[in-house]
Amino acid sequence: MTRTRVPAPSIVAALEHALGPVHGFVPLAEGEDSQAFAFRAEGLGSAAQAEHVVRIHRSREGFDKDDFAARRFARPGLPVPAVTAIGRVEDLSFEQSFEGPFFGKPFYCVSRRLPGSTLQDLPLDLVGPLAAPLARTLEELAASDLAGTTGFGRFDANGTGAHASWRAFLEAVAERDWSAARLDAQAMAGVERQLAIVRELAPSCPELRQLVHGDFGSSNVLTDGREITGVIDWSEALFGDPLYDVANLFFWRPWLACMEVQARYFERTLPADAGTAARLRCYQLHIGLRQIHDCALAGEAEDLLWALERNARIADQA
């Protein structure tokens, strides 16, 4: 992914132009493809003394989805930070603002800072007791009211999914431009086998239409060590089978220890039937294929190799 490298003074200038004087501006842990900072601003009305977060990204799309998710789905059982401002950083040196190709002026998104740390940053011995609260949060997420939304798969800031059915979303991974990935013959043979398995399993996957976060379980979940205090970054959110979120935990379990802990919890609690196992396999392969394609196009060789090997192992699980 292309990570922004916008100088802090440029970000402060954009915030002060929109919100007035900014105080306590400090960096936070970066996302995979974004920057993040905490701050306070006088122009936030009654919330002026509350801490806020500003994130910087080359695209606005994910920020608009964050705003949509906060307005539509936030409630006591599903804490989603309210978005207070979205804009562009105008004052910067373009050539030094990105790792990789130039994409134009980046966007910023200001949201209320929720308490807690990310699950990924939590000491591992504290993650186990959170497995049940995490599962309850996924249940709450899946129970969200989708009235006024349409479609399946990834949706836009208006709640419109890109596909007419869940099966269509799953099978669409084969329609990506795989020639642009420039994989060698051995890697492409593996991808073709995995695409065939997805096509074989997709018709048996239920046409459920519920809210799916799409990237749940590590840096996008906040906790105080007892409960879940925030679910953030809705850029990958979609409509479909909520088991897709569990499959994401399974796919990434070798990569992050906190995902392994959650995966083990669901291994103990999910139905032990062939249908559930087939859905998990299908969804993991789908997640992996998307990761392979994205990494190949971004030129991320190490991540690409990991994803290729991970998907090969999943494909071998009969």
In which residue ranges do the predicted regions lie?
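Short, surface-exposed alpha-helical segments at coil->helix boundaries
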Residues: 8-9, 67, 259, 263
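Short beta-strand segments
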Residues: 53-57, 84-85, 153, 211-214, ...
